[in-house]
Amino acid sequence: MKIEVNKITTLTGHRDPIYALDKGTDEQFIFSGSGDKVIAQWDLKTFQSEKIASFPAVIYSICHIPEKQLLLVGTSDGNVHVLNLENKEKIKILKNHSAQVFNIRYSLETNCIYTAGGDGNFAICSLDTFDLINIRKLCNEKVRNIDFNYKTSEIAVASGDCTIRIFDIKTLQEKKNFDGHQLSANIVRFSPDVKFLLTGGRDGHLNIWQVGDYKIIKSIPAHDWAIYDIAYSPDSNLLATASRDKTIKIWDSKTFELLKVINKENYDGHLNSVNKITWSTYNNYLISAGDDRAIMIWEINPI
């Protein structure tokens, strides 16, 4: 497979590193959250931005729940702020962590919020009542990332003790626990066909695991530094990895062949760590954000 990469534009406005991205209120919008404590929404058509809200601490994670018109915002002080997007009113603060909230995920199937904390805790709350349902101390390191596999009713959790943990989504029983990386496991992502679990670590490796027995299929030395995010294209044919080594890499999702390296030299990419990526269905744009305070929009097309 051959692809071409075109940079559409760079969006600027945040005053500090950007740590969080999520889909916006419509296909052509995205949300961003930054060290400047501001949530903004960006229009991928006009490239204009709107300030949505500001918060008392650095923003590390966001989760848009369109079904409820809510935006969940995780901050460096361990709080999750619940924002009503209709009136931009902050309606609740969930205080279940004592350190950064690195990831927030919502499951429509369970109607629960799942959070990964820098305090080593993995917490689950009801979205209806915001009550804490369960909290697990997984390790003495940071819990970094969460993903769901609804076909097998499993939750994968990555943490700083190098471990990947697999939980039953209904009972929260731990089903598997295995060393995912030589250094911190930063990101977990089930493939769209849910046959594989992809993980990225501080060791720069992209690891592919067989769902079920979670035996390793492939270990790729993908980056020179930590991998922070993994995103699949809307058609599932491509996947992208984002790294502290300042690059985004595009891979064939079936063969895991490296197709392109997006960097500063070749594509006027990021100056510093690339912290977050999301692949939009709007024009098939790949969106990236990093420590350079920039959001970049990329068009990735087969040749």
Enumerate the predicted regions with their spans.
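WD40-repeat beta-propellers
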Residues: I39-W42, V80-L83, F122-C125, I164-F167, ...
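Conserved strand-to-loop turn within each blade of WD40 beta-propeller repeats
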Residues: G33-D36, G74-D77, A116-D119, V157-D161, ...
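WD40/WD-repeat beta-propeller blade N-cap
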Residues: L11-I18, A53-Y60, K95-V101, R136-V143, ...
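Blade-level signature of beta-propeller repeat domains, shared across WD40, Kelch, NHL, RCC1
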Residues: S273-I303
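Residue-level detector of Asp-centered blade-edge/turn motifs that repeat once per structural unit
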Residues: T25-D26, P66-E67, L108-E109, Y150-K151, ...
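Short loop/turn segments that connect beta-strands within beta-propeller blades
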Residues: L44-T46, L85-K88, L127-F130, I169-L172, ...
